[in-house]
Amino acid sequence: MLPGLALLLLAAWTARALEVPTDGNAGLLAEPQIAMFCGRLNMHMNVQNGKWDSDPSGTKTCIDTKEGILQYCQEVYPELQITNVVEANQPVTIQNWCKRGRKQCKTHPHFVIPYRCLVGEFVSDALLVPDKCKFLHQERMDVCETHLHWHTVAKETCSEKSTNLHDYGMLLPCGIDKFRGVEFVCCPLAEESDNVDSADAEEDDSDVWWGGADTDYADGSEDKVVEVAEEEEVAEVEEEEADDDEDDEDGDEVEEEAEEPYEEATERTTSIATTTTTTTESVEEVVREVCSEQAETGPCRAMISRWYFDVTEGKCAPFFYGGCGGNRNNFDTEEYCMAVCGSVMSQSLLKTTQEPLARDPVKLPTTAASTPDAVDKYLETPGDENEHAHFQKAKERLEAKHRERMSQVMREWEEAERQAKNLPKADKKAVIQHFQEKVESLEQEAANERQQLVETHMARVEAMLNDRRRLALENYITALQAVPPRPRHVFNMLKKYVRAEQKDRQHTLKHFEHVRMVDPKKAAQIRSQVMTHLRVIYERMNQSLSLLYNVPAVAEEIQDEVDELLQKEQNYSDDVLANMISEPRISYGNDALMPSLTETKTTVELLPVNGEFSLDDLQPWHSFGADSVPANTENEVEPVDARPAADRGLTTRPGSGLTNIKTEEISEVKMDAEFRHDSGYEVHHQKLVFFAEDVGSNKGAIIGLMVGGVVIATVIVITLVMLKKKQYTSIHHGVVEVDAAVTPEERHLSKMQQNGYENPTYKFFEQMQN
């Protein structure tokens, strides 16, 4: 009986996977679907061969709105009549995701929940009802909710009946990915387990939770997938850093990746993966262990928004993933996280309630146990070159301590509720309120400790970056002061200095992006400070670069290399600003006359060494000679001599060194608040732009607008007065002399006649006479 039922279930599941709504499109091998993974090109199902293909245009990535998803379905399936979209019930494994602008695609898979593109008129899914299972449905015509809402309704309904949700489908569409009901099948817990066990015994390649037809996790192959994914992600990071370090002889990059945490995370991930078997109990055990892990950022420095399952809250919560390492409690979306962890963890809690002596399924791992003074230990230890690794370990210890305390409180809460079953309602409410306050207190305490940890880490990183920049600047000036100066050495020192400034800017932007995602209000408050700091970095770089003018021979020899370095730095700044500052355009007045910034590039200009900075001094970097500085020919701006005022007008000659230059002249750029406020520094369309305000043209435009406004206002006032006067003017058809001695009735009749009134009696007799 059971093997036959297992085969029937397997056949039904296979038929369901290949089911396509009928709209005159017979013969399709697969259902139209699309899948998205942020940072990669979208994928869509090839309905002819059943394989996933990358975006045909090579440009489309994450889509935020359901309307956009529907439109994208219609674009990739133009021959089908796509009318709606709905999330799939289960996540799938997809390989060969492509990055935008790259020809070769990575082979490691990602787990995502695809969207089904519905063809033609909506037809509800045909659900298979196994033996001892019940088919149920709910419809509410006054409700129009998403797939996730109805999935939750179905799951809760089955849980109330002490059963497990076996399958479900949407009913009565009312919008894009919105429906008015759900149909579902509830099976007894033991029956569901037997069914899945039988199906797994027949089909070794099937996997309840990580199910993807393209991936085989039997015999430890899951380890290979995880390791390949992590190795390729680490390879990408190393490749990018290798590009940054190209031609850098002294290796000036800030190395913040710690191998020790990565190895530990890899070992922990591998140990979890190797326990996977083809039985449902083993799969659920692995899922419970995965979903009970604490969120780990990993040793890398990216800030990728991900989700993890929080066992204390019983729901998924966001966190930032570094890009490599970490563990498998790491999901792309909240829906995917709940789909994997929600059902198994709720079943575990139900079993725990029914069997008090059973092992606690959500018991936290004790590998990261910490002492109460874990944060204090980090705060008391001075920073060093391994600051990032120390910070990661301190953060993990803090999270472990917090989870231990929360787990203890939740166990106490559960025990208190069990003991309070026979108490009055008021006492039960008091118990609940007490533990809620305790949980909130622990959360607030943990948040404060996290904030203190992050602020300390930020301060140490800033101090380290400042030291590196100061050292690079001193080496650069020393190279310029050498007699005779060596052009190649000067260029290498200049490159190290530019990289140090670039690191400072990258750190500032990443911190701002983190604050903006966590606390948008605080991000709005510190935005002006961030922009001021970025402007200081640009001006400091410009001032340092201008020192090359004092050694014309060196400047001429390394001109091409410097141009290439600045172009690379400019492209990097454009990319970083476009990715990190994704906010609407902020206007500060005269930007309406500026050109479109889609074609505007941020240039690194040269500024005078002495004297005040002015907006007219900001010119693009061009080729220069030994005796003069070229002008910006496009805008016809006069050349700026970047040499000291005392040397302007004198003929420079090769070999004139900088023996009298002091480090203090350019080590720091001091800016008061008034100078910062009056600068022409703005952010437009995610790019950093310096521009010179044309004061004369702006005044003329303002005067013209004022005169035009006065004229228009005058015309409006005159028109209103005339209309009002006309409204209250009496209608006269002629002048009729009225005797003052007549009665009021006659006077009233006279006025009526003046306004066109005709006595019907008079009119009747006039007609009779005629």
Curated annotation (Swiss-Prot):
Residues 695-722 are annotated as: Interaction with PSEN1. The modification Phosphothreonine is found at T729, T743. GO terms for molecular function: DNA binding; heparin binding; serine-type endopeptidase inhibitor activity; signaling receptor activator activity; signaling receptor binding; transition metal ion binding. Residues 268-281 have a biased composition (Low complexity). The keyword Ubl conjugation applies. Residues 291-341 form the BPTI/Kunitz inhibitor domain. The modification Sulfotyrosine is found at Y217, Y262, Y336. Residues 18-701 are extracellular. A motif (OX-2) lies at residues 344-365. The record marks R301, A302 as: Reactive bond. Residues 194-207, 228-264 have a biased composition (Acidic residues). CDD domains: Kunitz_ABPP-like. The modification Phosphotyrosine is found at Y497, Y757. Cu(2+) 2 binds at H677, Y681, H684, H685. Keywords: Amyloid, Apoptosis, Cell adhesion, Cell membrane, Cell projection, Coated pit, Copper, Cytoplasm, Cytoplasmic vesicle, Disulfide bond, Endocytosis, Endoplasmic reticulum, Endosome, Glycoprotein, Golgi apparatus, Heparin-binding, Iron, Isopeptide bond, Membrane, Metal-binding, Notch signaling pathway, Nucleus, Phosphoprotein, Protease inhibitor, Proteoglycan, Secreted, Serine protease inhibitor, Signal, Sulfation, Transmembrane, Transmembrane helix, Ubl conjugation, Zinc. This is Amyloid-beta precursor protein. It comes from Pan troglodytes. The lineage of its organism: Eukaryota, Metazoa, Chordata, Craniata, Vertebrata.
